[in-house]
């Protein structure tokens, strides 16, 4: 199987290298090409990726620090659509901080084939073996929950894109991640777009790698910070800036929920 893997990186040289090598070496039945959006790394990541091109099939795109996660993914996916029309069986969206297990991608491909070209969301566990990221199911409105491994036959609504296998024809139909997003929400939005286009999304049958949960410490949800600090962090590009949050909610849930949704975070901050 020919797989095009896309990810964004910034100043995680060793993790980036390990991610690429683990994916390739752990899935020998797959033929991988990588498109990597390096968002202005200063730790030698970009130069390392250039050197790795002598061994692996890697295209490196160079940013200047303003892409962030979703922006970098959008750039990489748009590049792939232009450079590689109809050239692959699958698109693989990954995060470079995932420690992948052996044959994890091959197993996801087998599951996708058995489930008739399903989008397979790779479930992540933390160091304690507990679910950390993966497929998502909405409960009511925009409130959601993480899906369990045992629910792999249950259709998902969207995903955290730590590792997502998308049939290439679905990628070509839906297109790239929405360029409006800079850091967060881009992956959730993309999953919802795939679902709207008629594609089935499912959780992987087993954990495909280790990726620990991001800590809330120092973020806008950290109640130990002052209200002003939380407000500033919320409107930061890596927080939940109001314009992007409103855009996401309106696009996917309608104007009514969007208006309610943009007010809720401020109430949380005020109430502490």
Language-model features and meaning:
Residues 217-272:
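Non-catalytic, C-terminal membrane-associated alpha-helical segments of glycosyltransferases
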Residues 87-99:
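Short beta-strand-to-loop acidic/aromatic patch adjacent to the donor-nucleotide binding site
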Residues 21-31:
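Short, acidic, metal-binding catalytic loop of nucleotide-sugar glycosyltransferases
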């Amino acid at each position: 199987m020919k797989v095009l893997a896309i990810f964004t990186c910034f100043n995680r040289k060793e993790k980036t290298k390990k991610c690429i090598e683990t994916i390739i070496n752990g899935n020998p039945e797959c033929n991988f090409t990588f498109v990597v959006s390096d968002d202005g790394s200063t730790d030698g990541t970009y130069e390392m990726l250039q050197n790795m091109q002598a061994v692996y099939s890697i295209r490196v795109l160079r940013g200047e620090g303003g892409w962030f996660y979703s922006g970098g993914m959008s750039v990489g996916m748009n590049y792939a659509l232009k450079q590689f029309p109809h050239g692959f069986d699958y698109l693989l969206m990954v995060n470079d901080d995932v420690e992948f297990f052996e044959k994890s991608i091959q197993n996801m491909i087998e599951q996708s084939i058995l489930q008739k070209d399903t989008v397979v969301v790779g479930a992540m566990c933390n160091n304690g073996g507990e679910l950390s990221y993966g497929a998502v199911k909405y409960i009511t409105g925009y409130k959601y929950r993480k899906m369990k491994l045992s629910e792999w036959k249950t259709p998902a609504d969207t995903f955290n894109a730590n590792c997502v296998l998308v049939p290439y024809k679905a990628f070509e139909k839906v297109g790239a991640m929405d360029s409006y997003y800079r850091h967060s929400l881009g992956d959730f939005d993309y999953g919802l777009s795939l679902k709207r286009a008629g594609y089935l999304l499912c959780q992987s049958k087993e954990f495909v790698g280790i990726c620990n949960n991001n800590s809330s410490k120092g973020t806008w949800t950290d109640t130990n910070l002052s209200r002003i600090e939380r407000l500033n962090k919320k409107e930061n590009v890596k927080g939940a800036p109001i314009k992007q949050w409103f855009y996401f909610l309106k696009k996917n849930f309608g104007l009514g929920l969007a208006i309610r949704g943009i007010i809720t975070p401020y109430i949380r901050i005020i109430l502490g």
